[in-house]
Protein backbone atom coordinates (compact mmCIF):
# COMPACT_ATOMS: atom_id res chain seq x y z
CA UNK A 1 0.00 0.00 0.00
CA UNK A 2 2.70 2.45 -0.98
CA UNK A 3 0.18 5.05 -2.09
CA UNK A 4 -1.00 5.38 1.52
CA UNK A 5 2.33 6.64 2.86
CA UNK A 6 3.95 10.05 2.63
CA UNK A 7 6.61 9.94 -0.12
CA UNK A 8 8.78 12.45 1.77
CA UNK A 9 8.81 10.57 5.08
CA UNK A 10 9.25 7.26 3.23
CA UNK A 11 12.44 8.54 1.58
CA UNK A 12 13.87 10.70 4.39
CA UNK A 13 17.43 9.58 5.01
CA UNK A 14 17.52 7.73 1.69
CA UNK A 15 17.03 10.29 -1.08
CA UNK A 16 15.62 13.16 1.00
CA UNK A 17 17.34 15.22 3.67
CA UNK A 18 15.92 15.84 7.13
CA UNK A 19 14.21 19.22 7.52
CA UNK A 20 15.24 19.55 11.17
CA UNK A 21 18.97 19.10 11.76
CA UNK A 22 19.66 18.89 15.49
CA UNK A 23 19.99 16.47 18.38
CA UNK A 24 18.03 16.72 21.62
CA UNK A 25 18.19 14.62 24.74
CA UNK A 26 15.12 13.26 26.50
CA UNK A 27 14.42 16.55 28.27
CA UNK A 28 15.03 18.82 25.25
CA UNK A 29 13.53 16.87 22.36
CA UNK A 30 9.86 17.77 22.92
CA UNK A 31 10.69 21.44 23.49
CA UNK A 32 12.80 21.64 20.33
CA UNK A 33 10.13 19.89 18.26
CA UNK A 34 7.36 22.27 19.35
CA UNK A 35 9.68 25.22 18.74
CA UNK A 36 10.34 24.00 15.18
CA UNK A 37 6.59 23.74 14.52
CA UNK A 38 6.00 27.26 15.83
CA UNK A 39 8.82 28.66 13.70
CA UNK A 40 7.41 27.07 10.54
CA UNK A 41 3.83 28.15 11.32
CA UNK A 42 5.01 31.70 11.99
CA UNK A 43 6.98 31.93 8.74
CA UNK A 44 4.13 30.43 6.68
CA UNK A 45 1.88 33.32 7.73
CA UNK A 46 4.35 36.05 6.76
CA UNK A 47 3.60 37.75 3.40
CA UNK A 48 7.30 37.79 2.55
CA UNK A 49 7.41 33.97 2.80
CA UNK A 50 4.39 33.26 0.61
CA UNK A 51 6.64 31.95 -2.15
CA UNK A 52 8.60 29.70 0.22
CA UNK A 53 8.65 25.97 -0.42
CA UNK A 54 10.19 24.83 2.84
CA UNK A 55 12.18 25.67 5.96
CA UNK A 56 15.22 23.80 7.31
CA UNK A 57 16.00 24.31 11.01
CA UNK A 58 19.50 23.75 12.43
CA UNK A 59 20.55 24.18 16.05
CA UNK A 60 24.02 24.80 17.44
CA UNK A 61 25.15 25.94 20.92
CA UNK A 62 22.03 27.93 21.79
CA UNK A 63 21.59 29.39 18.30
CA UNK A 64 19.03 28.56 15.62
CA UNK A 65 19.74 28.73 11.89
CA UNK A 66 16.71 28.73 9.59
CA UNK A 67 17.13 28.21 5.85
CA UNK A 68 14.21 29.56 3.82
CA UNK A 69 13.87 27.79 0.47
CA UNK A 70 12.08 30.17 -1.87
CA UNK A 71 11.66 30.97 -5.54
CA UNK A 72 11.50 34.71 -4.73
CA UNK A 73 14.53 35.55 -2.54
CA UNK A 74 14.16 39.27 -3.17
CA UNK A 75 10.74 39.26 -1.49
CA UNK A 76 12.17 37.61 1.64
CA UNK A 77 15.26 39.83 1.83
CA UNK A 78 13.35 43.07 1.21
CA UNK A 79 14.73 46.48 0.37
CA UNK A 80 18.32 46.70 1.67
CA UNK A 81 17.66 43.61 3.80
CA UNK A 82 14.92 45.28 5.85
CA UNK A 83 12.47 42.38 5.64
CA UNK A 84 14.98 39.70 6.61
CA UNK A 85 16.15 41.81 9.56
CA UNK A 86 12.55 42.13 10.74
CA UNK A 87 12.06 38.37 10.46
CA UNK A 88 15.17 37.77 12.55
CA UNK A 89 13.93 40.09 15.30
CA UNK A 90 10.47 38.51 15.35
CA UNK A 91 11.93 34.98 15.47
CA UNK A 92 14.27 36.03 18.27
CA UNK A 93 11.26 37.29 20.24
CA UNK A 94 9.35 34.07 19.48
CA UNK A 95 12.12 31.67 20.54
CA UNK A 96 14.14 33.74 23.00
CA UNK A 97 17.32 32.67 21.16
CA UNK A 98 19.65 34.15 18.59
CA UNK A 99 18.38 33.32 15.10
CA UNK A 100 20.31 33.30 11.83
CA UNK A 101 18.46 33.34 8.52
CA UNK A 102 19.77 31.92 5.26
CA UNK A 103 17.96 32.34 1.95
CA UNK A 104 18.21 29.47 -0.55
CA UNK A 105 16.88 30.20 -4.03
CA UNK A 106 14.92 27.51 -5.85
CA UNK A 107 16.18 27.72 -9.42
CA UNK A 108 13.35 25.73 -11.03
CA UNK A 109 10.04 26.37 -9.21
CA UNK A 110 8.12 24.33 -11.80
CA UNK A 111 9.75 21.19 -10.35
CA UNK A 112 8.91 21.97 -6.71
CA UNK A 113 5.74 20.23 -5.53
CA UNK A 114 4.93 22.79 -2.83
CA UNK A 115 5.13 25.74 -5.20
CA UNK A 116 3.03 23.91 -7.80
CA UNK A 117 0.37 23.01 -5.20
CA UNK A 118 0.25 26.59 -3.87
CA UNK A 119 -0.12 27.93 -7.41
CA UNK A 120 -3.08 25.62 -8.10
CA UNK A 121 -4.67 26.65 -4.79
CA UNK A 122 -4.40 30.35 -5.66
CA UNK A 123 -6.00 29.76 -9.06
CA UNK A 124 -8.91 27.82 -7.56
CA UNK A 125 -9.44 30.64 -5.03
CA UNK A 126 -9.64 33.05 -7.98
CA UNK A 127 -12.45 30.86 -9.40
CA UNK A 128 -10.35 29.38 -12.20
CA UNK A 129 -11.64 25.94 -13.27
CA UNK A 130 -9.86 23.31 -11.20
CA UNK A 131 -9.39 21.09 -14.27
CA UNK A 132 -7.80 23.93 -16.21
CA UNK A 133 -5.49 24.77 -13.30
CA UNK A 134 -4.45 21.11 -12.91
CA UNK A 135 -3.77 20.52 -16.60
CA UNK A 136 -1.84 23.78 -16.97
CA UNK A 137 0.30 22.94 -13.94
CA UNK A 138 0.97 19.42 -15.25
CA UNK A 139 2.07 20.77 -18.61
CA UNK A 140 4.45 23.25 -16.96
CA UNK A 141 5.96 20.50 -14.79
CA UNK A 142 6.52 18.14 -17.73
CA UNK A 143 7.94 20.94 -19.90
CA UNK A 144 10.44 21.69 -17.12
CA UNK A 145 11.87 18.18 -17.43
CA UNK A 146 10.00 16.04 -14.90
CA UNK A 147 9.71 12.29 -15.52
CA UNK A 148 6.14 12.22 -14.24
CA UNK A 149 3.56 14.18 -12.27
CA UNK A 150 0.31 13.39 -10.49
CA UNK A 151 -2.14 16.00 -9.15
CA UNK A 152 -5.23 15.32 -7.05
CA UNK A 153 -7.90 17.74 -5.83
CA UNK A 154 -10.58 16.87 -3.27
CA UNK A 155 -13.63 18.67 -1.90
CA UNK A 156 -16.77 20.30 -3.24
CA UNK A 157 -15.32 20.69 -6.71
CA UNK A 158 -17.04 23.41 -8.77
CA UNK A 159 -19.51 23.84 -5.91
CA UNK A 160 -20.93 20.31 -6.14
CA UNK A 161 -23.23 19.19 -3.34
CA UNK A 162 -21.25 15.99 -2.75
CA UNK A 163 -17.50 16.18 -2.19
CA UNK A 164 -15.32 14.03 -4.42
CA UNK A 165 -11.75 13.62 -5.61
CA UNK A 166 -10.32 13.94 -9.10
CA UNK A 167 -6.77 13.32 -10.22
CA UNK A 168 -4.68 13.53 -13.36
CA UNK A 169 -1.39 11.81 -14.06
CA UNK A 170 1.26 12.21 -16.74
CA UNK A 171 4.39 10.08 -17.04
CA UNK A 172 5.74 7.74 -14.34
CA UNK A 173 5.24 8.34 -10.60
CA UNK A 174 6.48 5.16 -8.82
CA UNK A 175 5.66 5.35 -5.11
CA UNK A 176 7.37 2.08 -4.12
CA UNK A 177 10.75 2.77 -5.75
CA UNK A 178 12.99 4.25 -3.08
CA UNK A 179 15.62 5.43 -5.54
CA UNK A 180 12.97 7.46 -7.39
CA UNK A 181 13.25 11.12 -6.37
CA UNK A 182 9.60 11.93 -5.64
CA UNK A 183 8.71 15.41 -4.42
CA UNK A 184 5.34 15.63 -2.66
CA UNK A 185 3.36 18.49 -1.15
CA UNK A 186 -0.16 19.54 -0.21
CA UNK A 187 -2.05 22.83 -0.20
CA UNK A 188 -5.54 24.10 0.65
CA UNK A 189 -7.74 26.47 -1.32
CA UNK A 190 -10.35 28.34 0.71
CA UNK A 191 -13.47 28.82 -1.43
CA UNK A 192 -17.04 29.91 -0.71
CA UNK A 193 -18.06 26.24 -0.89
CA UNK A 194 -15.45 25.08 1.59
CA UNK A 195 -11.87 23.83 1.59
CA UNK A 196 -10.40 22.25 -1.54
CA UNK A 197 -7.40 20.03 -0.86
CA UNK A 198 -4.58 19.74 -3.41
CA UNK A 199 -1.90 17.03 -3.51
CA UNK A 200 1.04 17.04 -5.93
CA UNK A 201 3.56 14.29 -6.68
CA UNK A 202 6.50 15.05 -9.01
CA UNK A 203 8.96 12.41 -10.20
CA UNK A 204 12.32 14.11 -10.73
CA UNK A 205 14.06 10.94 -11.92
CA UNK A 206 16.05 8.18 -10.27
CA UNK A 207 19.17 8.71 -8.16
CA UNK A 208 22.15 6.57 -9.09
CA UNK A 209 23.02 6.29 -5.38
CA UNK A 210 20.13 5.90 -2.92
CA UNK A 211 22.36 6.73 0.07
CA UNK A 212 23.12 10.35 -0.81
CA UNK A 213 20.13 12.69 -0.33
CA UNK A 214 19.70 15.35 -2.98
CA UNK A 215 19.89 19.08 -2.27
CA UNK A 216 16.63 20.81 -3.34
CA UNK A 217 18.02 24.33 -3.20
CA UNK A 218 21.42 25.96 -3.23
CA UNK A 219 22.22 28.77 -0.74
CA UNK A 220 22.29 32.16 -2.43
CA UNK A 221 22.37 34.63 0.45
CA UNK A 222 22.75 34.70 4.20
CA UNK A 223 21.82 37.15 6.92
From Swiss-Prot:
Part of the 30S ribosomal subunit. Forms a tight complex with proteins S10 and S14. One of its GO terms (cellular component) is cytosolic small ribosomal subunit. InterPro entries: KH_dom, KH_dom-like_a/b, KH_dom_type_2, KH_sf_prok-type, Ribosomal_S3_C_sf, Ribosomal_uS3_bac-typ, Ribosomal_uS3_C, Ribosomal_uS3_CS. Belongs to the universal ribosomal protein uS3 family. Binds the lower part of the 30S subunit head. Binds mRNA in the 70S ribosome, positioning it for translation. The keyword Cytoplasm does not apply. One of its GO terms (biological process) is translation. NCBIfam families: rpsC_bact (TIGR01009). Gene3D superfamilies: 3.30.300.20, Ribosomal protein S3, C-terminal domain. Keywords: Ribonucleoprotein, Ribosomal protein, RNA-binding, rRNA-binding. This is Small ribosomal subunit protein uS3. GO terms for molecular function: mRNA binding; rRNA binding; structural constituent of ribosome. Residues 39-107 form the KH type-2 domain. Pfam families: KH_2, Ribosomal_S3_C.
Amino acid sequence: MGQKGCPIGFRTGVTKKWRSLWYGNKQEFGKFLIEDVRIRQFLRKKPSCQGAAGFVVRRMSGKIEVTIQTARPGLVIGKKGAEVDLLKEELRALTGKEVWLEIAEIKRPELNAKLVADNIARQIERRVSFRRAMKKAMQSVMDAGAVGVKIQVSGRLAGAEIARSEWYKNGRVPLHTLRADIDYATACAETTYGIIGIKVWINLGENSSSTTPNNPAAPSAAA
